[in-house]
């Protein structure tokens, strides 16, 4: 979902100019500019309410809004990837919440740089993220998971952070069921991946 605050400014201004030309002697220019600024301000407030301050990604509120829009359009081939940071509590416990917040910011950047144009990454809560893919497939979803893992490995090998990032991932196709059911399905798959991770890694 995209926002176009510029349009909210330009359109009232154009209407004001046209009205002033049609009705000579009536000044509507400044009023239309003021209305345009009000619309831009409201639009930016809406946008900011959908953005997570730490990761820079869209938030849980936007996820609900976005999925509601997708349900109304009855889009097919919608897939989700649920991601949860492995050992995130250990990062906070060992290095403090400031470093933990930095890890969340780095994950936000990695996800933003990993996703194609038909995918939207969002931070759900804490160390949990979700990516919604439209016009997707099992193959493209699996490829995106591999891309994310590769970019996480690249981050770990090219930075001097005191921690190493790793994420458990679960996937599910959205068939128009309730969001609660969709999240339960994808959560189950994610925890299966996390369980595998902890078979070979310490908590």
Please report, for each region that a protein language model flagged, where it lies by residue.
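Signal-transducing coiled-coil linker helices
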Residues: 2-54, 60-70, 177
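Catalytic-core segments of nucleotide cyclases and related cyclic-nucleotide turnover enzymes
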Residues: 142-149, 153-159, 166-168, 172-203
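Short beta-strand-to-loop capping motifs
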Residues: 131-136, 173-174
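Conserved long alpha-helical elements within nucleotide-processing catalytic cores of c-di-GMP signaling
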Residues: 59-79, 89-116, 122-126, 130, ...
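Beta-strand residues that line the small-molecule/cofactor-binding core
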Residues: 62, 164-166
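A structural signal for short, well-ordered beta-strand segments
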Residues: 80, 129, 167-171
